[in-house]
Amino acid sequence: MKKFIFFFKNYCYISGSMLLFSLIDLLLWIISLYCVGLVFWILFALQCVYFVWWLWKNIFYQLNAFRLVNFVWDNPLSVIIGKLGTGKTLLLTYLSQTMKLLTDEIYSNYPLEDDKVKVLTFKNLDFTDRTKPVPPDDSVILFDESYLYIDGTSPHDEKKVHSGKIPWIVLARHFRHRALFTAQREGMIWNNIRQLASGIIIPISLKKPVAKKGFNFFNRFFIMRMGIFQDITDYEIWKTKSVERTAEGKRAKHKSDVGLGIRFFKIIIPLEFANKYDSEWLKFVRDLKNDEIVNEKFYYWSEITKLSVKERLELFDIDILKKNLKPRKEKGNGKDD
């Protein structure tokens, strides 16, 4: 029943965006009623072509949605790698809704406007911690901005601090967990997670709905093109070749290889999913810092000339200059004097 509701909801979403084309098809049908001979058959053929295209596009997006859901479900550890603005958090939010087809245990480390999604922190996955429980079987764990928790560029230092997470990383399959971690670069993800991840998801492009005032019926979904890999090595090879082709002025290849577990496809993400999260929810951290500042004044550059050289140096807070420009001790202060 859940799959039927999910299919029907997305099907209607696409159909609504194609209402304009349906009106055009209706217009062609009305015109064909007043035509005979060759003109009639041409209009009839256009209607048939449009209907086949419309039906294929609906089924195409639905199959891709199920392909992504099954891919995540089959991989205990997955990473989402993409530059800023490619829709990593949007994709996590989309999965927070679509993975409900298979489980009710959804956890995230960022706020979602969903009563069925539970709060999760890194301590839930730490076996040296005795304050927060590990999620139960068939849990989907959505972990955004993983670099804020573990510095992937310093794996040896982090291993000492986060050694309690290693048992969970290794045993995630035994716990029947499905976890996804996001980062802008693969090197930002902790090596222990990156090397054991059997699912690599790469958002390639994101077509956003066009913001319009008033009635906005035809632009209510995102279209995301992505690639999925089952091995980090395959992804790195594809990335290297893509960079080489781009440097030569060629387009990067997005060719699927089922044998290697490499697929490229598009999904649609309803606008209502994007409204379930705030992409700037961590801005409260700025307030924590500013609350402890005594002098909150900001200077204009036109005011700098009114300050003394010493005040400017203190204001700019350039440590190297402050260290090397310390006043020397005056002569004559030695013991001989």
Curated annotation (Swiss-Prot):
Organism: Spiroplasma virus SpV1-C74
Family: Belongs to the plectrovirus ORF2 family.
Residue ranges that the Swiss-Prot or TrEMBL entry lists as coiled coil: none
Presence of keyword Transmembrane: yes
InterPro entries, alphabetized: P-loop_NTPase
Gene Ontology CC terms: host cell membrane; membrane
Membrane-spanning intervals of the chain: 4-24, 26-46
Membrane topology summary: Multi-pass membrane protein
Claim: Phosphoprotein is one of the keywords in the record: no
Compartments, as annotated in UniProt: Host membrane
Protein name (Swiss-Prot/TrEMBL): Uncharacterized protein ORF2
Alphabetical UniProt keywords: Host membrane, Membrane, Transmembrane, Transmembrane helix
